Amino acid sequence: MTLSLNNLTFIIVTFKSEHIIYECIKSLPKNSKIIVIENSNDQKLKKDLEEKYPEIKVIVQENNGMGSANNTGIRLCETDYAFVINPDVKFHNNTLQEIISFSEKNDDYSILAPISDDVRFPNYKIKNKEIASNNFDYLSVDSVDGFAMLINKNKFKDNIYFDENFFLYLENDDLCLRKK
């Protein structure tokens, strides 16, 4: 199955992020499937989001870490693709359409991520001027930053996503290295 907005769910893990999540949600296409995992056991964000966006599924749970919360969202998602994003992410211009177009031509990936203006890879750093001066569709890397990771669930037949032994930080590196 190919990537489309109909076959994509956005997973947003928060921890008392009510001050930033609304801008994130506004940057997503209308009628997007969205699952928010609130990791603080605070019902206020759930109540506020459900009032403003009744179509969004909001789960409030104990904080067992970022990887665990992402796994909860991915497993609840009923689409073939899960876009795990941080609550401070804002998609600009045609970023999502570019990702969908790329995916249509290159569907043999487990994880796909947009490039940021300051992305760090092990022993490798890409700067804005390097991005602007190079004409490339993609870079194959060992790991991507966890701020925005498109997960092709069809490549995870074992349903093993993030290692929940990583509470916070490096869970994205571990996942990428296991799927390389």
Predicted regions located by residue number:
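Short, well-formed alpha-helical segments that are part of the catalytic scaffolds
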Residues: I12-K30
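Glycine-rich, basic loop-to-helix element that forms the pyrophosphate-binding segment
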Residues: Q61-C77
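Short aromatic/hydrophobic "clamp" motif used to bind/position activated sugar donors
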Residues: A82
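Conserved donor NDP-sugar-binding/catalytic core segment of glycosyltransferases
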Residues: V89-K125
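Short, flexible, basic/aromatic active-site loop/helix in glycosyltransferases
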Residues: Y124-A148
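A short, conserved alpha-helix in the catalytic core of glycosyltransferases
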Residues: S143, M149-Y161, N165-K180
